[in-house]
């Protein structure tokens, strides 16, 4: 983020099975992992919503519905508070290894896109994320190590804020959908 970036940033990501929310003010970060509804988590880290200067939202890849909920929440808050929004890939919210996110249907999201776990070249790599946990046996059989620290498997919204794109209108933040939603419109 540049020197002209806002001072108090609400950052959140809901794209994985382990969502997270943070209020970033200077070097101080207050964050929590998913334990309740998104707005409850936001209430946990933000004392006064009027102090939010900007919002950073995880854009995926991940659950189609969860990404839509996160973007709708960012939009509602941005409009109500009249603050700018930036997006960042959920994959940037992990540290300590290569992120692998559970894509359901026997697939994972990674830097390479969407694939079956056994198709990833993971030999000698340290993996993090809910996909790494779900497919631990597959990845370890392929020569990877799945991080033992549970904190490495949840997105860190502080990292998300560090990798955010330019701040602007929420309409300029695009979701990163790598496949169509599971739900289909009825005929």
Across the structure, where does each feature detected by a protein language model lie?
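N-terminal, well-ordered alpha-helical segments
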Residues: 36, 40-43, 71-75, 79, ...
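Alpha-helical context
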Residues: 31-35, 53, 67-70, 154
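Oxyanion-binding and handling regions
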Residues: 1-26, 30, 36, 40, ...
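Phosphate/pyrophosphate-binding loops at sites that engage ATP/ADP/AMP, CoA/4′-phosphopantetheine
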Residues: 42-54, 121-123
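Phosphate-handling active-site elements
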Residues: 47-50, 78-88
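Short glycine-aspartate micro-motif
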Residues: 9-11, 52-58, 66, 97-100
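DPxDG-like acidic metal-binding loop motif
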Residues: 54-83
């Amino acid at each position: 983020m540049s020197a002209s970036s806002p001072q108090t940033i609400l950052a959140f990501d809901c794209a994985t099975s382990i969502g997270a929310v943070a209020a970033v003010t200077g070097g101080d970060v207050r964050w929590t992992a998913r334990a309740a509804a998104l707005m409850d988590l936001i209430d946990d880290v933000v004392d006064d919503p009027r102090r939010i200067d900007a919002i950073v939202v995880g854009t995926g890849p991940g659950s189609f519905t969860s990404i839509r909920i996160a973007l709708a929440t960012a939009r509602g808050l941005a409009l109500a508070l009249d603050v700018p929004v930036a997006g960042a890939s959920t994959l940037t919210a992990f540290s300590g290894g290569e992120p692998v996110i559970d894509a359901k249907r026997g697939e994972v999201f990674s830097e390479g896109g969407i694939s079956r776990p056994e198709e990833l070249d993971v030999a000698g790599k340290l993996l993090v994320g809910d996909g790494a946990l779900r497919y631990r046996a597959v990845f370890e059989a392929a020569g990877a190590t799945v991080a033992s620290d549970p904190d490495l498997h949840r997105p860190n919204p502080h990292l998300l804020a560090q990798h955010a794109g330019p701040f602007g209108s929420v309409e300029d933040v695009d979701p990163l959908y790598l496949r169509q939603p599971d739900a289909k419109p009825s005929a």
